[in-house]
């Protein structure tokens, strides 16, 4: 829950969502696992800084300001890291570091799954209309742990029903074999959702809102994934989906989660719930 302690930590954070220290840590990790092939290659720190600016401020790739790397270079490196699986590995690495910093085991046992529909600008690529949310765009499918740390993310057209989105999370779930329980909302009550959880060795727990309750209600466990979605509003480039490809769209969300996780490691918030 959001408490006075959380508010104090939030007010004490740096003005920028991404600090140079977080950018440097991400760049150093990438250099260790994917060393530059040439001494004249663009420094990874410059690449990550340009990508962070693009995600933080928003706008077209061509809008990267003078003084940062060329937009084609930034986009090319993002596609390269996406194709090689480095972004997914980096997301898992940061998630493990955050769990250790919170006093937890590296392998989570509880997963919280939810979706978020966002508008899509007029670009090429698949999209759809979410009749429930009245949104024309795409749907983000999030897999987070008990603290709201991002474990995996997938992107599907917004017209895909929530109960049909779990298949998109299969690669992300397979990367975390320690998961044993999944918390979902009432949109995942279909038998195919239970079958998906059973297939991956997880027990399904559906947390639904009481129809008699009015207004905003904090739901058990589910509030952490809503908070994770809420933190994305700090990234101007993620307020609307701008990517022409679904995998690039997922990579942009994953990179924002990595940079936010790196910043949280520098200035963490207190965690009250110690359940994994």
Task: Give the ranges of each region predicted by the language model.
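Short alpha-helical elements
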Residues: 1-276
